Structure formats: C-alpha cells, structure tokens
Curated annotation (Swiss-Prot):
<keyword id="KW-0963">Cytoplasm</keyword>
<dbReference type="GO" id="GO:0005680">
    <property type="term" value="C:anaphase-promoting complex"/>
</dbReference>
<dbReference type="GO" id="GO:0070979">
    <property type="term" value="P:protein K11-linked ubiquitination"/>
</dbReference>
<comment type="similarity">
    <text>Belongs to the RING-box family.</text>
</comment>
<dbReference type="GO" id="GO:0045842">
    <property type="term" value="P:positive regulation of mitotic metaphase/anaphase transition"/>
</dbReference>
<feature type="zinc finger region" description="RING-type">
    <location>
        <begin position="34"/>
        <end position="77"/>
    </location>
</feature>
<keyword id="KW-0132">Cell division</keyword>
<feature type="binding site">
    <location>
        <position position="76"/>
    </location>
    <ligand>
        <name>Zn(2+) 2</name>
    </ligand>
</feature>
<dbReference type="InterPro" id="IPR013083">
    <property type="entry name" value="Znf_RING/FYVE/PHD"/>
</dbReference>
<keyword id="KW-0479">Metal-binding</keyword>
<dbReference type="GO" id="GO:0008270">
    <property type="term" value="F:zinc ion binding"/>
</dbReference>
<feature type="binding site">
    <location>
        <position position="23"/>
    </location>
    <ligand>
        <name>Zn(2+) 1</name>
    </ligand>
</feature>
<feature type="binding site">
    <location>
        <position position="34"/>
    </location>
    <ligand>
        <name>Zn(2+) 3</name>
    </ligand>
</feature>
<dbReference type="GO" id="GO:0070936">
    <property type="term" value="P:protein K48-linked ubiquitination"/>
</dbReference>
<dbReference type="InterPro" id="IPR051031">
    <property type="entry name" value="RING-box_E3_Ubiquitin_Ligase"/>
</dbReference>
<dbReference type="InterPro" id="IPR001841">
    <property type="entry name" value="Znf_RING"/>
</dbReference>
<feature type="binding site">
    <location>
        <position position="51"/>
    </location>
    <ligand>
        <name>Zn(2+) 2</name>
    </ligand>
</feature>
Length: 84
C-alpha cells in the first residue's frame, strides 16, 4: 500500500522561554505583548537582566528611564544590567 499526500497545511505556535509566565512590571503574559504593543512577537521581545529576571523590553526600558539615581531590577532591587 502506498500513501500519497495531496495537500498539507502546517500549523505552528511559538512561545517565549522565560523563568516566569508574566512580566513583573505590567503583569501581562509573556506569550502576549506589553501594553504598548498591539501584537506579540519580535516587536515586543523579552529581555533578561544579569539577575536572571525577565521583562518585556518596553516595560523595563520605561522602568529604568523613570528611575532618577541608580537603575535597579524591579523584582530583586539589584543594579540592573542587561544579560548578554
């Protein structure tokens, strides 16, 4: 018996791999997008700090820009440095 495929429709899903399920700043799911974005994906990436906490890029940038003196992680209060 031989099987011949006449038509194939692929379906895919994606998700960010992070320590948590939600952003610690906006509390939105990482599989969604931050409040500033309309659609999730590459335009709303996740960023990690050296402390290994993860946030939407737009959320942490707003947080850091709002701090006057030294920039700290909103979760553990360590000095914020982006993980490379």
């Amino acid at each position: 018996m031989k099987v011949k495929i006449k038509c194939w429709n692929g379906v895919a899903t994606w998700l960010w791999v992070a320590n948590d399920e939600n952003c610690g700043i906006c509390r939105m799911a990482f599989n969604g997008c931050c409040p500033d974005c309309k659609v999730p994906g590459d335009d709303c990436p996740l960023v990690w700090g050296q402390c290994s906490h993860c946030f939407h890029m737009h959320c942490i940038l707003k947080w850091l820009n709002a701090q006057q003196v030294q920039q700290h992680c909103p979760m553990c209060r360590q000095e914020w440095k982006f993980k490379e």
